[in-house]
């Protein structure tokens, strides 16, 4: 029988922000956007903020109406990536196989390791304590015979708990839980189930698989199996990303093309950081523009494989100028990289400017990985925080 762990870092973004600024502890903290931005949604919020009815994906304006005294933050995304990697590094010391589901979620397969770690529950407590002691990050851990059970268990354990469902006890554990507890049950499916008088997971198990197959097709069959405690007992192998992209939606539609280029410069730096972390080069650069009237344009160009910020940014700017032919304010801008190949560093007897620059960018990447993305800012155009003007750096 498989033994699958699901580790979920509790209110991860908030936890990292509290490490950066301990004064935030005990306060309602909302990460995602600030009320004055106009647009944006809640990416994460503390348990103190949830007492006011806030939740992820809530529009920031609505969140502010419910919790005007909360602390609203854009988020320190470079730090989130750094702490996520640090957690994964700890887990890799123990888990034979890991599947990272998101920046704050990890599946681990500990099948066949009881003779090494003993009690799985006590081992989970040890793992939980090590992450707290070394990184100050609270987490919840679910343990079950498959991924679905482990995921539900970690949600059940929040905050900072551990839930272990022994093999053979899955149906009994699931029966009293609301049907929306099953991963993948969204609003539409929930409404359909309620219309059929199905409110608890146990209600699903009282009916046949064929009933759900007829009502909802293959998804209905999968739902029935999950309700009966069945699920994937193996983890997905790491997959190679097919693209790297970053986008920025403006709080207010932007018509200053200098500021738009400055945004593109920042986004280029972020995607190139990810590119070098993978030790890849890109051969296709794309940009995306969405105007205030929601007309969306994309442009792409194939280039010689590179991981050089300057080359990629210059390509992106040319694409921007080709795409931006309308005298309309811009709502969103994004950059997209595809067609990857492995980076192979070659020793050069005589180093040209591009080679020196590439080495500099790789050094910058290492520093940002260690101290956070904002540790080093590369200058081209800096927009002051009040958006009243521009400063050019040489």
Regions from the language model: what does each represent?
Residues 101-105, 144-147, 280-284, 328-332:
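Short Gly/Ser/Thr- and Asp/Glu-enriched loop/turn motifs at secondary-structure junctions
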Residues 12, 35-38, 292-295, 340-343:
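Short, charged/polar surface micro-motifs in flexible loops or helix N-caps
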Residues 305-394:
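Acidic, metal-coordinating catalytic segment for phosphate/diphosphate chemistry
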Residues 6, 181, 189-330:
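DNA-contacting surface of Y-family translesion DNA polymerases
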Residues 110, 143-147, 227, 289-291, ...:
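A general secondary-structure junction signal
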Residues 106-112, 298-301, 345-350:
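Short, hydrophobic beta-strand segments
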Residues 1-222, 235, 273, 354-394:
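Gly/Gly-Pro- and Ser/Thr-rich, intrinsically disordered tail segments characteristic of DNA damage-repair
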Residues 25-27, 68, 137, 283-285, ...:
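A generic structural signal for short beta-strands and their flanking turns/coil linkers
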């Amino acid at each position: 029988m498989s033994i699958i762990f699901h580790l979920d870092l509790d209110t991860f973004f908030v936890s990292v922000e509290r490490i950066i600024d301990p004064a935030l502890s005990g306060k309602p903290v909302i990460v995602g956007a600030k009320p004055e931005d106009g647009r944006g949604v809640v990416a994460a919020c503390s348990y103190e903020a949830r007492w006011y009815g806030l939740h992820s994906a809530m529009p920031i304006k609505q969140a502010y109406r419910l919790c005007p005294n909360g602390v609203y933050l854009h988020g320190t995304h470079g730090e989130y990536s750094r702490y996520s990697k640090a957690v994964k590094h700890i887990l890799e010391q123990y888990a034979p196989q890991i599947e990272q589901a998101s920046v704050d979620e990890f599946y681990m397969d500990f099948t066949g390791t009881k003779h090494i770690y003993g009690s799985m529950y006590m081992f989970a407590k040890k793992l939980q304590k090590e992450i707290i002691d070394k990184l100050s990050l609270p987490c919840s851990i679910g343990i079950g015979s498959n991924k679905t059970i482990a995921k539900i268990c970690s949600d059940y354990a929040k905050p900072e708990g551990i839930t272990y469902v022994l093999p053979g006890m899955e149906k009994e554990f699931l029966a009293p839980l609301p049907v929306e507890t099953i991963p993948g049950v969204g609003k539409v499916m929930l409404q359909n189930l309620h219309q059929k008088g199905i409110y608890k997971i146990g209600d699903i198990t009282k009916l046949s698989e064929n009933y759900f197959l007829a009502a909802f097709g293959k998804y209905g069959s999968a739902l029935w199996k999950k309700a009966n405690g069945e699920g994937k007992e193996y983890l997905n192998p790491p997959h190679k990303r097919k693209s790297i992209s970053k986008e920025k939606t403006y709080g207010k539609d932007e018509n200053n093309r200098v500021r738009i280029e400055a945004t593109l410069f920042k986004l280029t730096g972020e995607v190139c950081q990810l590119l070098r972390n993978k030790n890849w080069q890109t051969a296709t650069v794309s940009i995306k523009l969405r105007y205030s009237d929601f007309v969306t344009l994309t442009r792409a160009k194939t280039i010689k494989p590179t991981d050089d910020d300057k080359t990629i940014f210059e390509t992106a700017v040319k694409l921007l100028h080709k795409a931006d032919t309308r005298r309309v304010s811009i709502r969103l801008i994004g950059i997209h990289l595809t067609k990857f190949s492995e980076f192979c560093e070659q020793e050069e007897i005589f180093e040209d400017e591009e080679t020196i620059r590439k080495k500099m960018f790789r050094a910058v990447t290492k520093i940002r990985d260690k101290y956070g993305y904002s540790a080093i800012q590369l200058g081209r155009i800096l927009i002051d925080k009040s958006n009243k003007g521009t400063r050019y750096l040489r």
